[in-house]
Amino acid sequence: MIDPFKRLARKGLFLFDPETAHGMSIAALKSGLVPACQITPDPRLCQTVAGLTFENPLGMAAGYDKNAEVPEALLKLGFGFTEIGTVTPKPQAGNPRPRIFRLVEDEAVINRLGFNNEGHEAAFGRLAALSGRGIVGVNIGANKDSEDRIADYVAGIRRFHSVARYFTANISSPNTPGLRDLQARESLAALLSSVLAARDEVAAASGRKVPVFLKIAPDLTEEGMDDIAAEALAHALDGLIVSNTTLSRDGLKDQRQAKETGGLSGVPLFEKSTAVLARMRKRVGAALPIIGVGGVSSAETALEKIRAGADLVQLYSCMVYEGPGLPGDIVRGLSKLMDREKAAGIGELRDSRLDYWAARKV
């Protein structure tokens, strides 16, 4: 339940259109107006995934800090890691405004931003100036007008390999025409071959091998999931992120806003994304890391992602409704859930409801 102060702050922020409010929140983090979260590190929440050690399993998903303006400020809110981007080689404006819509009754957001960002060079300059403390991933994408989208992903690997703690290849945004076609098996094989070859080449030269994750859509057929799992394993991908936004509008209360085109995120995405997560875990086996995203709004929903097969979880849209105190609340809540479950480590609980979620309707 949102407290009265948060309710008042949200009401004030919601007087502005969503994109203006987003810019205001970035400015507040930059200026230090948002207080840091005081969390006592809990070793039970610590996870080593893809060779990286995460103080806790909660991350900020890509899409909020597109241009790497506030990664350190986000980490101070209690996140165990954060992900900047999606960044493309060249700056691009994205789709025309309005392009973000709040569905307040549903605690959801629809966006059709279209990879608006300042490009590789701007983000690289900011990341290079960071202290180096904390895990900051880089989510890479392709320009809308690119003649060779795979080359754009390779360019991202080459540009950011010295500053990224991990990469995410985002091929699942519904807002760049044709981008999701890269999830088709033949295209995906070509993408992974090129991206991982570039990563290995720069690793050989630098001595620094950066893990690569693939972010996939929730709107996949069973055959599509089979294909992605097979290619991920065949190419020794470092991990998956499940999932991006959905095109589905099932069960929404706000039918007026539901008519807007774009990807839906927030609370209504939880069931679908968690079911796809479990299905992918079944397909890839126990060893491949998976980050679960979609509808995480509490410690309970974060833990449920882990029970469904995730090693780590991310959120974004639910913070729009709950405010910057949400990550701290979730991390503290996870510690309490560890007490309740009498678990020595959160990894013990992974897959404990895998069968349940894998059987759920997608």
Curated annotation (Swiss-Prot):
Subunit structure comment from the entry: Monomer.
Gene designation per UniProt: pyrD
Species assigned in the record: Rhizobium leguminosarum bv. trifolii (strain WSM2304)
UniProt keyword annotations, A-Z: Cell membrane, Flavoprotein, FMN, Membrane, Oxidoreductase, Pyrimidine biosynthesis
Biological role: Catalyzes the conversion of dihydroorotate to orotate with quinone as electron acceptor.
Membrane topology of the entry: Peripheral membrane protein
Name the record gives this protein: Dihydroorotate dehydrogenase (quinone)
Pathway as given in its UniProt record: Pyrimidine metabolism; UMP biosynthesis via de novo pathway; orotate from (S)-dihydroorotate (quinone route): step 1/1
Annotated GO biological process: 'de novo' pyrimidine nucleobase biosynthetic process; 'de novo' UMP biosynthetic process
Top-level taxonomy: Bacteria, Pseudomonadati, Pseudomonadota, Alphaproteobacteria, Hyphomicrobiales
Keyword Iron: no
Active site as annotated: 173 (nucleophile)
Binding residues annotated for substrate, in chain numbering: 66, 111-115, 170, 175, 244-245
